[in-house]
Swiss-Prot record:
This is Glycogen synthase. It catalyses: [(1->4)-alpha-D-glucosyl](n) + ADP-alpha-D-glucose = [(1->4)-alpha-D-glucosyl](n+1) + ADP + H(+). GO terms for biological process: glycogen biosynthetic process. Belongs to the glycosyltransferase 1 family. Bacterial/plant glycogen synthase subfamily. Synthesizes alpha-1,4-glucan chains using ADP-glucose. ADP-alpha-D-glucose binds at K15. It comes from Streptococcus mutans serotype c (strain ATCC 700610 / UA159). The gene is glgA.
């Protein structure tokens, strides 16, 4: 099967979040099953700086962006069995950052037009064209409404994946003629219109052959007003083609037996090294070195979406419990200041590291006893899976991907991989933390069972890619 991914970012070339992880890992995994896989990405300045000497120039052509002719350079690298093609245009992509420009609409309109026209020129006409988030959401529409005259494109099936429904790509409808070079009939009849704007994500949901999200629970949640961000009605209408597939993680990268960032390696059969990592981390971040006290780890952006209004609200109460907290992350100034204050007030209990450090993040995943993730909403979430690989038990708000990946502890059946609370409130966060501490202190054998359960759960991309491949085969 021939599969083409088109996305705004992809590891290791350019990455800001979970989308980049997916584009870096899923194609590589699909290749293992004898699929022919290619990826089209923008050629950002950050890509040029890191990989410019490895990437080859193939050719160039020009595309129409409204009334203008724009240069489209095609670059290529073959990596991990996947052909990566890059759309090169310095005006649009040499900005010092991937997103957040005043003309993002124009930048990604150009990218989508260039990617669609490049397929024929690179001689890769896919069976499945898989696009991601709003930056490429107009592609299913353009394929069927603008490029339908190209015979070679007639058999292409499209899949659209929503990584975060909050960012929908809402623009002035004049963009249809001025940038995409199409008429406004589909806007006037309501197909592309939402809240009196051109909505790219709505277009993708209506025109794609299948729509996926990054977890089954999130697929259900976005059909509700609480999580749908205004598009819940459209999601309910198109629910027949909507499904969820949990992302995987790179299990080679997050492996306690080989991780180069750890002080001591360990495994599910011998957890003695975990205690040594805990001591090394406590020493590094300035906490008292105590094996008997549970260490609660946090690695996150400090935002409302990640639930830190609950944590900050409950910090005073948490500091009265017999525990230590190590935090790594940046975000809202109010949250940063609150954690920093508690770090100064309770130096024996709280270490607040208001920065981001990849090595320290790995050490927190590996050395903590509990990993705190109380997100208000979480399409998938990767940190909880990373923590579980190291026998660190997640404590989560049971929402989205957190609900799908963390099984709450059952004291009667001795099952579970972590702890969870359903009501999004500080009270239940603290109550659940107290329950976890009770298991840590008073039910040591149960704790070991939970650790082993967590470490043996399969979060590899091979499992996730099988689900996508099944979906592709249904279409093709």
């Amino acid at each position: 099967m021939k599969i083409l991914f088109v996305a705004a970012e992809g590891a290791p070339f350019a990455k800001t979040g979970g989308l980049g992880d997916v584009i870096g890992a899923l194609p590589k995994s699909l290749v293992k099953n004898n699929n022919e896989v290619s990826v089209i990405l923008p050629y950002y300045d950050v890509v040029d700086a890191k990989f410019g000497d490895q990437i080859e120039d193939l050719f160039y052509f020009f595309t129409n962006v409204g009334w203008r002719r724009e240069y489209v350079g095609i670059k290529h690298i073959f990596r991990d069995g996947v052909d990566f093609y890059f759309i090169d245009n310095k005006h649009y992509f040499y900005r010092g950052q991937i997103y957040g420009e005043f003309d993002d609409g124009e930048r990604f309109a150009y990218f989508q037009l260039a990617a669609l026209e490049a397929m024929e020129k690179i001689q890769f006409i896919p069976d499945i064209l898989h696009v991601h988030d709003y930056h490429t959401a107009m592609i299913p529409y353009l394929l069927k409404e603008k490029y339908h005259w190209i015979n070679a494109y007639h058999g292409i099936k499209t899949v659209f994946t929503i990584h975060n429904i909050e960012f929908q790509g809402q623009f002035n409808p004049s963009m249809l003629g001025e940038l995409f070079g199409v008429g406004d009939e589909r806007y006037r009849d309501g197909t592309l219109r939402w809240n009196d704007c051109l909505n790219w994500m709505k277009a993708a949901v209506l025109y794609a052959d299948r729509v996926t999200t990054v977890s089954p629970s999130y697929a259900k949640e976005i059909m509700t007003p609480e999580f749908g961000k205004g598009l819940d009605q459209i999601m309910r209408m198109e629910s027949g083609k909507l499904s969820g597939v949990v992302n995987g993680i790179d299990t080679d990268l997050f492996d306690p037996e080989t991780d180069p960032h750890l002080a001591v390696h360990f495994s599910k059969d011998d957890l003695s090294g975990k205690a040594k990592n805990k001591a090394a981390l406590q020493e590094r971040v300035g906490l008292p070195v105590r094996e008997d006290v549970p260490l609660v780890g946090i690695v996150s952006r400090l935002t409302d979406q990640k639930g830190f209004q609950l944590v900050v609200d409950q910090l005073n109460t948490m500091m009265q419990l017999d525990l230590q907290i190590v935090l790594l992350g940046t975000g809202y100034a109010d949250f940063e200041n609150a954690f920093a204050w508690f770090g100064h007030a309770y130096p024996d209990k709280m270490s607040a590291n208001i920065t981001f450090d990849l090595e320290l993040a790995q050490q927190i995943y590996a050395a903590s006893d509990i990993f705190l993730m109380p997100s208000a909403f979480e399409p998938c979430g990767l940190s909880q899976m990373m923590a579980m690989r190291y026998g660190t038990l997640p404590l989560v708000h049971e929402v989205g991907g957190l609900r799908d990946t963390v099984i709450p502890y059952n004291e009667f059946e001795k099952t579970g991989t972590g702890f969870g609370f359903q009501d999004f409130s500080g009270y239940w966060l603290t109550k659940t933390l107290e329950a976890a501490l009770d298991v840590y202190y008073n039910r040591k054998e149960d704790w070991k069972i939970l650790q082993k359960n967590a470490m043996t759960t399969d979060f590899s991309w091979d499992t996730a890619s099988q689900s996508y491949e099944h979906l592709y085969k249904e279409l093709a």
